C-alpha cells in the first residue's frame, strides 16, 4: 500500500488582491473539509488532487469559483472517483464585513496608510534649515606646530633640509595655514622623495679607496671612453656636489624604485641612491656604469664584462674583447699543433 499524496490548495484572484483574513478563513475551512470527508471517512483514499479557489470581484462581492470543476466540465470529462469531492467556499456578506473590520483594526489591510496618525511621522528630515554653521577658523599657531614637526622629521645633515625649511617659512608667511600645510607636504614630497622616512647616508669617497686593484683596472678601462680615468671622476664628483640640486625631485621615482628592489645577491654596503641627486642629468649626465658605481660603491663587474665582450653601443667589439679572442684563438692553435705531434 503506497503512501497517500499530499493535498494542496491554491487561492488566485483574477481582479484584485485577496483580503488576508478571507484567504485564511477559506483555507482553514477547505482543509477541515478535506480532513473530515476524506481522511477520516475514507482511509483508503490515496490520490487526492490539489484544488484551486479563484475569487472574482463582481459588484463588490467575492464569489468563489471552483476552477477545477469548470475545467473538467469544459473538457467533457466527469470527475473521477479518485479526485475526491469539491470543497464549497461560500461565505455570507456579514462574515466578510466582520473580517474586513478586524483587518482594519489590526493594521493588516492592504489599503493606503493612514498618515493622519501621529505615530506615522517622517523619520528622516533632509532639510538644511536646522544644520549648525560649521565654518572653521584656522588657528594661527598651527603653522608653528607644523614647522616644528617637519623640522624634527627631516634628517640632520640632509642637503635638502634648508631648502625645505625655507620653502615652508615662505608658505606659512605668504599664505594662510589652510593651504600652507598642503604646500608643505607637496614640497617635501617633491624635494626629498622617500628619503625622509629613513636617515640619509653621508656619501664618503674614502670608502672607495679599498677596492681591489682588479676592480680599479676594470673601471678605468670603462671610464676612459666616457668620463676619463677613475681619478678624474673622483675630482669631478667633488665639483658636482657643489652644483645646483634642482633636479632632486626628478630622481624621487628612481630612489623609491631602488629602495623597493629586492636584490638577489646582497651587496656588501647599503645602496646610497641619494648620491644620484648630486648630478644634473641635463648638464652633466652619467652613464649607467657610473650610476651603479656611485650607488653601490663598487664597479659593476658583470656589466663591464658584458661591455668588454659585446662592445659599445655602436656594435663593434672593444679592445679587451679582441685581445681575449686573440688569446683564445692562440691557445686553440697550440692545442692543434700538440695534437699533430702526438699522432706522429
From Swiss-Prot:
Q: Which residue windows are coiled coil?
A: none
Low complexity bias: start-end ranges: 319-330
Keywords noted in UniProt:
Cell cycle, Cell division, Cytoplasm, Cytoskeleton, Mitosis
The record's comment on protein family reads: Belongs to the IBD2 family.
Q: Where is the composition biased (Basic residues)?
A: 331-344
Instruction: Please tell me where this protein is predominantly located.
Output: cytoplasm
Q: Where can this protein be found?
A: Cytoplasm, Cytoskeleton, Spindle pole
Instruction: Output this protein's name.
Output: Protein IBD2
What biological-process GO terms show up in the record? cell division; mitotic spindle assembly checkpoint signaling
Annotated region (Disordered), positions in chain: 71-115, 234-255, 310-344
Record's Gene Ontology CC terms?
A: cytoplasm; spindle pole
What's this protein's function? Answer: Part of a checkpoint which monitors spindle integrity and prevents premature exit from mitosis.
* Entry annotated with the keyword Cell cycle: yes
Q: Which InterPro entries match?
A: IBD2
